[in-house]
Swiss-Prot record:
Belongs to the Fmt family. It is an enzyme of class 2 (transferase). One of its GO terms (cellular component) is cytosol. Attaches a formyl group to the free amino group of methionyl-tRNA(fMet). The formyl group appears to play a dual role in the initiator identity of N-formylmethionyl-tRNA by promoting its recognition by IF2 and preventing the misappropriation of this tRNA by the elongation apparatus. This is Methionyl-tRNA formyltransferase. It catalyses: L-methionyl-tRNA(fMet) + (6R)-10-formyltetrahydrofolate = N-formyl-L-methionyl-tRNA(fMet) + (6S)-5,6,7,8-tetrahydrofolate + H(+).
Amino acid sequence: MLKLVFAGTPDVAVPSLKAFATDPRFDVVGVITRPDAPTGRGRKLTPSPVKAKALELGLPVIDLKPRSPEFMEALNDLHADIAAVIAYGNILPKNVLDAVPMGWYNLHFSNLPKWRGAAPAQRAIWAGDPTTGADVFKVGEGLDDGPIVASLTIELTGRETSGELLDRLAEEGAPMYVDALAAVGEGTATFTAQPAECLEYAHKITVEDARISWTDEAGAIDRQIRACTPHPGAWTELFAEGPIADNDGSTAKSLTLHILAAQPADQSNPNTPADLKPGELKVGKKNVWVGTGSTPLELIQVKAQGKKAMRAADWARGARLSPAACVR
């Protein structure tokens, strides 16, 4: 039985933790995660999803900073043979990598070397990739450039959000991850160097990146919205010559509008407007459309600043938009 230390923080790491903890080939001797963080309006200190699951499973937890002497002491005391790391959120220094005899192995949510970096699933959707996947690779000092031990590829539907894609890859990748590290322990794993071609970097998507430019074509905006959902959330500014009602009776000359769901407008629908300028709004009985650099985009669900998420048509009726209202 291999002694394994697991490092991870968010929800996408939980399926892999569960898979290792319930596999008889492994003894999870410790779980490394980031410290409790303040969340919600009350800013209450809350454990990470991985820490919560580890405590539920009765596993020891290390939530210290990886460059501290206390962290190294705690890691060495585990006497782990091998380590799994997925979405931990901290860079592991060389002395930490060297402390585990068989090395550290990462489950990365792309087919490397495409989309190395922090946001592989998001970038795959934004780029309109027809396929993506998950790879298990050995961690080194470079950025996601180690040899690949296992890989899976899936087809994208063209309608998933990054949150949905990450959930799918986390679930489908977990059993592959476990089998790959078991093969490493047995000495039967095959290590394949990453090819030099197809290298692209998946830089983190910032809030400013998520702002929509309505002069882009509808398909590109649709991909941007899905890539930014749920985080950091695609958004735009709503403007009008007169004040905009904000559903509760208050008014503002402009407000931030988050676009939670949208789709390219159905061109076969006779109600779909054909000549909207970029950023121009058209409100129907059951639909809200926005002009783009190509064909209109239909808004499905939105969230105005300080308000709850709601159907776009319901929001538009309550907002009582002036004919001059637009987004930009």
